[in-house]
Amino acid sequence: MRGWIKLLLLLVYLASFHAYYRERIEALGIGLPLVLYLGMFAVLALALLLAAFSRPGWLRWSLALAFTVSAIFLDAYNRITDSYLTYSAFVSMVYAGGFVQEALQQYHYAITLAAARALLLLFGLGLRPGPTPRLPWLLPPVAPVLGLLALIAILFVRAGEGARGLPVMYTPLAYLSLFGYETLHDHVGPRQPVTLAQAGPAMARDIVLLIDESISGNYLDLNTPAGVTSHLGQAQPGVSIVNFGYAASIANCSADTNVTLRYGGTRTDYLRINSTQPSIWQYAKRAGLGTVYIDGQRTGGNLQNLMTETEKRDIDQFIQFDDTPVVQRDMAALERLVALLKDGRPQLIVVNKVGAHFPVHDKYPDDFLKYQPALPRGRYVDIADTGTRDGFDGRPQDWVLYRNAYQNTVLWNVGEFFRRLFAEGDLSQAVVLYTSDHGQDLHERGNPGLNTHCDSDPVPEEGLVPLVVIQGEGLRTLDWQAHLQANRNASSHYNLFPTLLKLMGYDGTAVSALYGRSLDMPTDDPFTFNVRFNARLGAKPDFRHIDLGQVVTPASVLAGQPMPVGKAD
């Protein structure tokens, strides 16, 4: 009797994904691919049912736990993003592990639903089966392993593709196996030393790369009149502000963008460059600059965005804010930046701000509650990197609350940040390059899902970021105005690394040959961001072009009719 109950639990669990299977069947249509899909589905489903009859309890429960955790991962991802988990997206999730606490808090409702459904799988596999059919004793525990190996083989030869529509508990385990294999075997060579020649000294005493978090270019007033006040669109005493308008990010996930900003990967060769070429820190030290990293996101010395201990050794000052609440982290980073700008030392300063990464419930003080109604506040103000998602399930009204909370956060962590920087900072000997790691999908179009970025099939806003140069008014650095008209709304993150190297005094011709065009040249950028950054096993990157005519702005949302950038304001 217990055996039949177990089978019923597993069949009910499998059947609960009927819409997932139907979508795949409809996409394949009638033909050989459908036959192959149905055959693989039958093999994996049968292997799962056989696993339920494994005799050793420890083995049965081990299989149950592994499959359950895997199923929860994929089910929750599908609920959150309303899209399929590709292998590239899986790798990006692994690299974004530093945000796991925020993700659990942000998406706890979707994860809870996935976990509740997975209880059917857990008990269907784990409960003692009782009397079993006459089966070879090795078949039940070996069958799911063989099924998993078969799926891994398919994914390997198809560059990570081929699991769509199959029983969900196998896919993340197969992805994890492939990722482990690649980690062990993919080595493109050792890190190289700096070989570029310098044409002269650094052009400024302080060179600053200011990387915001989750700040979408279409929500700031410097590009959209109805956007949030940034203080970047108005003249400021003693400084020159050059607005390059909208820019394309490297990718729509933090780790992918940040590691490329630090190593200078190009669209055509980023995997090799990021893995083997010198870091921005190495270039700075060769140019005679000190190196400072201000990390507002992590604490306790924990590294993120694919930074390693080896890379960290080239950083002279590694700054985090262990005892500072999240809501004050960007202001703490500002205070340290202001102090560094005044110390008279030549240095490269890279800042990772808190910005507006989810959750945004409590990332701004009460005085900045301008956009209302907003998400509920006050429950986690003393806990770093957490927030609440109670009552948020992705309905249109929920996204209204989210967008308002997001704009309040931007008003504080961008607007107030720059107001204080211009008021307190000595920028007379500094050049600051400001951007964000990626944009945001705030679901202005009413598209389904709970996700804001890292989607495998994103809206263009996920790759849309601001790009601004700020420098002391009397400084003679690069000629930002030379090609500004052509480069405005037409450049990308890929232009930043060569710009930084030229500011450090490296030979421009050599820099361009290795890393591409800087912002003082016609960038001729394709204006794309990469949604398959972790292109593995022979797969190709997937660069998505941003059509500014399709980007939604706050003004169009307020008007109740999403409109193109060029027309909304």
PLM feature segments, named:
Residues 1-168:
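Transmembrane and membrane-interface helices of multi-pass
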Residues 2-11, 25-38, 51-60, 68, ...:
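Membrane-interface soluble catalytic domains
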Residues 193-195, 376-432:
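A long, amphipathic alpha-helix that forms part
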Residues 223-227, 428-430, 435-475:
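Histidine-centered active-site microenvironments of extracellular/periplasmic hydrolases
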Residues 264-266, 401-402, 477-484:
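Flexible glycine/proline-enriched surface loops and loop-helix/loop-strand junctions
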Residues 268-271, 323-324, 402-407, 456-459:
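A short acidic, glycine-rich active-site loop
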